[in-house]
Amino acid sequence: MLRPGRARAIVALLVMLMVMLASCAQIPRSGPVGKSKDEGAGNPNAPVFFPAAPRAGSSPETVIEDFYMAGSGYEDDYPVARQYLTQAQSVTWKPDKRAIVFREAQVVKAAGENEYLYELDLAYSVDADGVATQFPPGTKETIPVTLEQVEGEWRISKVPDGTAIPEETFKVIYGANPIYFYDPTFTYAVPDYRWFIKKNTVKSMTSALLAGPAPYLRGAVVSAFPSGMKLARESVPVVSGAAQVDLSAKELFDASAEDRQRMQNQLALTFRNQPDVINVQLRADQDLVRVEDNGTVLPPVLDKSVPARQIAVNNGDLVRYENNRVTPLPDIQSVAGLGPHSPAESPVSQTAAFLNGDKTTLYSIEPGQPARQLTTRTTLTGPSFSPNDWVWTAGPGATGAAEVVAYKPTGSAPGAGIPSVTMTPAWLTGRTVKDFRVSREGTRALVISEANGKSAVQVTGIVRNPDGVPKDLTVPITLLSNSAADQGAWVNGSTVAVMSGSATSTVVPELLSLESGEPQQLAPWDGLTSISVGNGAEQIYGQSDAGIFQRVGNGWELQLKGPTEPAFPG
């Protein structure tokens, strides 16, 4: 059985060795023109571990423990870890298939002869394309391991592909990196965060990009690279700051000039945080392919911003809240008789939407027109607009099952039917949707739902038909939160703010990131009942009975008393 003290000591020793090496062996950032880095180009200060080789006389339990500890020695294809395997198993074992990250581990004897189980408290699982799945404490996974004696020493003869490493080691060796895809109109860039070994980042990112988006984004985003395009060689060298991406020639030459420009833009965005990469070269069988920029392809918008104004409710009617002033919404008729709550405003038009007083009916309103009823249900989430003017809400359908509905009221003539779509995702079966917020580029949605008293914060992809009409929601990813969140808002393209609102309790909002599995708690504040976010974490607003507050540093500062439920466009 793995002794926790021994495991911590080994991890501490390895981390200390890594730090010492990093401080003594900085890779130069300058050199002769034309100097090439190999396919491992990425972080020049990437940590290197030197795990211990097998020791004579080790027990089966120790061999299993040490084998998985040796998974930190990734350079040159895990040579030390392979020493713990029989010759046959060493040849077939594929460590890059999966990385299992654990909080605690122990070896237990299984029923069969020379068979053992490596029991883990699972923290993450990372697949071959760097897609990470996070698990809450207490999630168990068991790895079966079989050993045999080779020249009097125990060696592993059967083990699944992949590595299993402690969470502390994982956070040192691996880093989260966004690879970028497009929204279906090629207007916006959408981040898809992957976890890669820091030493091999550029090549790993390129392979993952060619393989396509993570499961929760499939169908919601598009790539400039056609399906089936591959690297022509298993490396992406960086020469004098240029990442040389050598692709299969036929697919590259078959692509239009516009598509090649989009390919280059997509790679440039993906490599933008890599310190060695200044620009990108597309190559076909090692020959440079020139990409002409004739101005017809615009770079995609990264981290789409929202206007500085907010919509709010004041004296029972819809108003605009901007620069700490309240003004009427331009050319919008009064809706005071409907008791508006949870207002939302389109980011691209003057259309607004809101719920009635008991939050059972959704209305939309356009300049110069009366409010129009869109749907009535036993309960509804506050409306949220996408950048193509669809307004979304969620609530129980006729059978009680959770439904997500979208309407496009903008431009519909008075009295005419309003286009609408109803979706009943299987993954929402048995759940009550508390909040539904479309991301600013329109390809994803933040979904907060509850079942059996437990809330889940998830991000789903929005699948659309070619004409832009919503069609489906993908199976989501889950972001771990420390609170029983019931509402949230997008902070930027990779972060959301969530909280459990309460007029009578102290509320602690959290920032949850696609990049990091650790929630960031914001300063607590009494009585926060709603939250809104502009452009970035410095523009977070909370509302309580005392007024509207803005996050300032590690606290909250009163902005204005009177208006309630402020919301930025979207």
Swiss-Prot record:
It comes from the Bacteria. GO terms for cellular component: plasma membrane. It is a lipid-anchor. The keyword Cell membrane applies. The keyword Cell membrane applies. Its main location: membrane. It holds the Pfam family Germane. Keywords: Cell membrane, Lipoprotein, Membrane, Palmitate, Signal. A lipid is attached at residue 24 (N-palmitoyl cysteine). It is found in: Cell membrane. A lipid is attached at residue 24 (S-diacylglycerol cysteine). Residues 1-23 form the signal peptide. Belongs to the LpqB lipoprotein family. This is Lipoprotein LpqB. It comes from Paenarthrobacter aurescens (strain TC1). The gene is lpqB.
